[in-house]
C-alpha cells in the first residue's frame, strides 16, 4: 500500500487497503486476529526445508522489518541456511545480483562457492547504494549495544529523539485517525 510500483497503487489501495485490510483488521482493539494470522508467514515455517535469502526494506509501510526478522530467526532455529538483506527503501526490492547469484548458484545448483561462509546480514546503510550493502556477522549486529532514546516535544510539526532526558517536556496529544480516505 503506497509503495512499490506506482502504476498499481490505485488498485492496491482500493482492493487491499480499503477492502481486505479495512474489513479484516480489528480496528477497535488492534488485537492479532484470524485475519492477521492468515497473513503471517511465521505460522507456515515448520515444513520449510529451503535455504532462506530474506530481503526487506527498512522503510516499508506495509510489512514492518520486525516481521522479516522473525522469519529469519525461525529459519535459523530450524537449522536452515539463511542470510538477510535490508535496504533503505519501501516494500519490495531484491538483494544485489552478485549476492543472489552466489546464493542461488550454491543452493539451487550445488556449486561450492563459499557463500555459506559469508556474512549472514547485509545492510544498506544510509545514503549507500543498494548494490553496496555493509556486511555484518548477523542481524542484529552482535557488536551493537542497546541505547535508551527519549522523546522531545515538537507538535504540531514533529518531535525528536535524544539520548538525554528532557525535564520540561510539556504535554502533547496523538490522534489515531482510523479513516483511510
Feature locations, PLM:
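C-terminal, loop-rich substrate-recognition/catalytic regions characterized by aromatic stacking residues
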Residues: 94-181
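Accessory cap/linker subdomain of secreted extracellular hydrolases
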Residues: 1-47, 115
Amino acid at each position: 500500500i503506497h509503495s512499490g510500483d506506482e502504476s498499481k497503487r490505485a488498485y492496491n489501495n482500493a482492493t487491499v487497503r480499503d477492502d481486505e485490510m479495512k474489513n479484516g483488521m480489528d480496528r477497535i482493539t488492534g488485537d492479532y486476529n484470524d485475519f492477521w494470522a492468515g497473513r503471517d508467514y511465521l505460522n507456515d515455517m515448520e515444513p520449510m526445508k529451503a535455504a532462506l535469502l530474506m530481503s526487506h526494506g527498512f522503510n516499508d509501510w506495509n510489512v514492518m522489518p520486525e516481521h522479516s526478522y522473525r522469519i529469519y530467526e525461525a529459519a535459523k532455529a530450524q537449522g536452515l541456511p539463511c542470510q538477510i538483506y535490508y535496504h533503505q527503501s519501501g516494500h519490495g526490492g531484491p538483494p544485489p545480483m552478485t549476492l543472489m547469484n552466489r546464493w542461488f548458484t550454491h543452493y539451487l545448483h550445488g556449486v561450492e562457492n563459499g557463500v555459506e561462509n559469508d556474512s549472514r546480514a547485509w545492510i544498506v546503510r544510509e545514503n549507500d547504494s543498494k548494490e553496496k550493502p555493509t556486511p555484518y556477522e548477523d542481524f542484529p549486529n552482535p557488536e551493537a549495544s542497546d541505547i535508551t532514546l527519549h522523546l522531545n516535544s515538537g507538535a504540531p510539526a514533529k518531535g525528536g529523539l535524544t539520548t538525554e532526558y528532557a525535564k520540561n517536556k510539556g504535554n502533547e496529544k496523538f490522534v489515531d485517525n482510523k479513516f483511510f480516505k
